[in-house]
């Protein structure tokens, strides 16, 4: 290995170093967020290890319980939820947690409380575990006004109030994508070091894309604007080439591809799910936050996604997110329908 390659190998930007550098830019910072993030990262490493060993360790399969969404809990879901709840509480920096797996919010014991609220889906896309498809953890972080008198209202904030959001994808590699409100960066877990290394600095989504990502099995139940947009993707009338359909069925994997390559991810409302399918707090908001930070847009069919004010912790919403121009097209179709109504 030549000297230049060796220097590159040893001068690594780890996620801890990155966050400490960000912290040093804010003189008022006391390091609380850095500590919180280190516990989130630890949870991601643990779950990554468990996912990789799932088949051998008999973690695949049903655990005999059901979660608040009505789905049967898979063993890895249960384990992942326990890991993140314990990691977040033990950080001493959280006061309230909302998990996709738990019906009620978790209020942290006053002796361990900090100033942050964390919303998370510990293992999104877990129905794909058996076939080896990429799955992931999604999280968002808010700050509360008064950690000693925290209420559920602290969680029911619009997404634009988030301090940070991210996801960790467990696939051919373990990739953590993070935004602390000043751009988006991607880190890949180096198994030999046990550290997340900066591999995708300052991610920017292309302004236009050639890929659309949607479950077309629901097409017969879609509304007019969604149907028109997808038809235009497949049969463009302006001489352009049709867009390619790519749909994995794991939100983390589909959004990750959209973020890197451009295009649009759609999970619209339909007759079967008039309020949409994805949960606002720990799916729609974190992914919308990341998209906007990367130069894209996120839209619910009625408004900017991050302006939505949730009223319930497991509230659902339609979502269209991705490249700026693609989401702009969807917005124009909804506006046109509203004008003719």
UniProtKB/Swiss-Prot annotation:
Top enzyme class:
hydrolase
Q: Which positions in this protein are listed as binding substrate?
A: 124-127, 215, 247, 267, 277
Cellular component aspect of the GO annotation:
cytosol
Major localisation: cytoplasm
In which residues is Mg(2+) 3 bound? 121, 124, 283
The record's comment on cofactor binding reads: Binds 3 Mg(2+) ions per subunit.
Any idea what this protein is called?
Answer: Fructose-1,6-bisphosphatase, cytosolic
Native organism is Musa acuminata
Q: What is the lineage of its organism?
A: Eukaryota, Viridiplantae, Streptophyta, Embryophyta, Tracheophyta
Q: Which gene encodes it?
A: FBPban1
């Amino acid at each position: 290995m030549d000297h230049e390659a060796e220097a590159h190998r040893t001068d690594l930007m780890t996620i801890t170093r990155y966050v400490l550098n960000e912290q040093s830019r804010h003189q008022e910072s006391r390091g609380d967020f850095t500590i919180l993030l280190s516990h989130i990262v630890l949870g991601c490493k643990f779950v990554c290890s468990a996912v990789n060993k799932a088949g051998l360790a008999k973690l695949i399969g049903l655990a005999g319980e059901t979660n608040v969404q009505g789905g049967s809990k898979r063993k890895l879901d249960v384990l992942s939820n326990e890991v993140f709840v314990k990691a977040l509480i033990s950080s001493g920096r959280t006061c309230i947690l909302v998990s996709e797996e738990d019906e009620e919010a978790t209020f942290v014991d006053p002796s361990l409380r900090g100033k942050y609220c964390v919303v998370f889906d510990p293992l999104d896309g877990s129905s794909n575990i058996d076939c080896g498809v990429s799955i992931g953890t999604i999280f968002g972080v808010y700050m509360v006004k008064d950690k000693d008198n925290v209420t559920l209202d602290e969680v029911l904030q619009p997404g634009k109030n988030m301090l940070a959001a991210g996801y960790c994808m467990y696939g051919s590699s373990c990739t953590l994508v993070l935004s602390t409100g000043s751009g988006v960066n991607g880190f890949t877990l180096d198994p030999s070091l046990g550290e997340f290394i900066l591999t995708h600095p300052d991610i920017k989504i292309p302004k236009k894309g050639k890929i659309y990502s949607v479950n077309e099995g629901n097409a017969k139940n879609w509304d007019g604007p969604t149907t028109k947009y997808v038809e235009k993707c497949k049969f463009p009338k302006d001489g352009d080439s049709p867009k390619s359909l790519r749909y994995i069925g794991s939100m983390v994997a589909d959004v990750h591809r959209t973020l890197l390559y451009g295009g649009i991810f759609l999970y619209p409302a339909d007759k079967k799910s008039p309020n949409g399918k994805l949960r606002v707090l720990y799916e729609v908001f974190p992914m919308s936050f990341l998209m906007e930070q990367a130069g894209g847009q996120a839209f619910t069919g009625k408004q900017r996604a991050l302006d939505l004010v949730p009223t319930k912790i497991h509230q659902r919403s339609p979502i269209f997110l991705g490249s700026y121009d693609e989401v702009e097209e969807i917005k124009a179709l909804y506006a046109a329908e509203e004008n003719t109504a």
